[in-house]
């Protein structure tokens, strides 16, 4: 089973494909990861279209079965929150077009499932990702956040 974790952003949407074979949820493998980058010199419509087309290509390339994403978080800056909502909307549409079910988790639940602490810092989450997947957690936090939400989903499935 291939699971995609997504960290939404209009600037840099992080994604990670994790694989679990034969329902062995103790053996999680990182298949691939990356970021969908958009330029703030483009129109919002062009940026959203890039997110849509790149995510659709990723979903088709890796035969993704399910998706996971953090629940929406509204911050104090209304403009930032609005732009995040635009990106999330396109991500939801893309998953729907590809017929991929989405599972959403709160940020605290993701952190708690990875580190045991719902208020863990991003560095602690990265440290645990390195231990769980036996990889080096480098790059940007949008990718590690995507990996974390995918692991959270796998752990949620395993619990049932």
Swiss-Prot record:
It comes from the Bacteria. It comes from Ehrlichia ruminantium (strain Welgevonden). Keywords: Cytoplasm, DNA damage, DNA recombination, DNA repair, DNA-binding, Endonuclease, Hydrolase, Magnesium, Metal-binding, Nuclease. The keyword Metal-binding applies. This is Crossover junction endodeoxyribonuclease RuvC. It is found in: Cytoplasm. It is an enzyme of class 3 (hydrolase). The lineage of its organism: Bacteria, Pseudomonadati, Pseudomonadota, Alphaproteobacteria, Rickettsiales. It catalyses: Endonucleolytic cleavage at a junction such as a reciprocal single-stranded crossover between two homologous DNA duplexes (Holliday junction).
């Amino acid at each position: 089973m291939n699971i995609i974790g997504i960290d939404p952003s209009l600037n840099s949407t992080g994604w990670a494909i994790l694989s679990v074979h034969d329902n062995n949820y103790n053996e999680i493998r990182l298949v691939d990861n990356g970021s969908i980058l958009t330029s703030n010199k483009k129109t919002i419509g062009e940026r959203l279209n890039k997110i849509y087309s790149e995510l659709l290509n990723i979903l088709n390339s890796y035969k993704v079965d399910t998706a996971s994403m953090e629940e929406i978080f509204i911050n104090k800056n209304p403009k930032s929150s609005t732009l995040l909502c635009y990106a999330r909307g396109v991500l939801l549409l893309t998953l729907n077009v590809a017929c991929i079910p989405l599972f959403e988790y709160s940020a605290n639940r993701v952190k708690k499932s990875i580190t045991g602490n719902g208020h863990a810092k991003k560095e602690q989450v990265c440290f645990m990702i390195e231990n769980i997947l036996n990889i080096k957690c480098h790059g940007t936090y949008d990718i590690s956040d995507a990996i974390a939400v995918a692991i959270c989903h796998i752990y949620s499935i395993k619990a049932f």
